[in-house]
């Protein structure tokens, strides 16, 4: 009798899980106030949201914990003085602003094309780290074209003027990847203002681990 009474009390107060809940009952938002965000990718509207399957797991491409270091060494939180490090909510905010027509922002996937073929963050454009690295064959003319045509810098009597240059939000594979850090460090060498460079340190590793939408080249 006492056991029956105790069970009744626990059930009525919600202290026993009855097992009736399903994954469909538990939506997965980006934040408490944001379920999804719509951005432009390849001229099309793409909805960024998290995988709604509560049983989803990490994809194999980012399941490794121990890539050899070097070269895959853990990157610091502060990459360089003046460079702001972003999380997921912040990069989504930049993506939304860019998609709404703010052309002062450019979100850059710094990875080589073979990585990008596997998927990227919707709204990002690919400018591989090798394209800005003289040590990897990038010549002054091609670097200059990127500065002028993609980043909005201007050349004045042989010197770069970054007054109207875009705010660049850069990422690569994650906290163990050196591709976006390489891009950022080269830009700083070229005189690009640190306050106009943002870094999403978590990159594709964190993005995919959180089940956020990934854009494939065909999408």
Q: At which residue positions do the language-model features occur?
A:
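Bacterial N-terminal signal peptides that target proteins for export
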Residues: 1-9
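Flexible, polar/low-complexity N-terminal or interdomain linker segments that lie immediately upstream
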Residues: 23-118
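N-terminal signal peptide c-region/cleavage motif recognized by signal peptidases
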Residues: 18-20
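Catalytic cysteine-centered active loop of the rhodanese-like fold, especially the PTP/DSP P-loop
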Residues: 145-204
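Active-site neighborhoods of enzymes that stabilize oxyanions during catalysis
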Residues: 210-219
